[in-house]
Amino acid sequence: RDTWRVEPELLEPLLNDRTRLLALNYASNLTGGVNDVKALTAMAQGAGAMVYVDAVQYASHRLIDVKDLGCDFLACSPYKFYGPHLGVVYGKRERLESLRAYKLRCASNDLPFRFSLGTPAFELIAGLMGTLEYFQWLAAETGCGGDRRQLFEGAYAAMGAHEDALSEQL
């Protein structure tokens, strides 16, 4: 099959006790195809591998729940969802604690600072916070309320409905 996705039945025979890491994209920037990250994660972890997900293309279209996916690491960039050019990385605490950090000896060993190689880009972090505030505003404008997670769900629902309406015209 040429689905341009990672097919579970084709991946499974490739996983074994020598597999250390499965790195996959959540969505393709070329085809728009979306991988079943939750199923692929379970399969890889069942073989003893860690899972890294590149969600750059997906994060602008759908809300991500890393706990539901079960992945060990996930990365995206806010520039894909109206924010600044900044890398955002999620990692399970036990995985992050087990990784060696390449840093100066005087730098903190505490998470998340142990992976910072210099002064944080405060202006980019402020831009990211502005993006998140925009999402909350958008949710409120479309009649959504609730806690922060519910506001993000509402914002993504509104953006998805708008994308769908635009796509219908194609």
What are these language model-derived features?
Residues R1-L170:
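Pyridoxal 5′-phosphate
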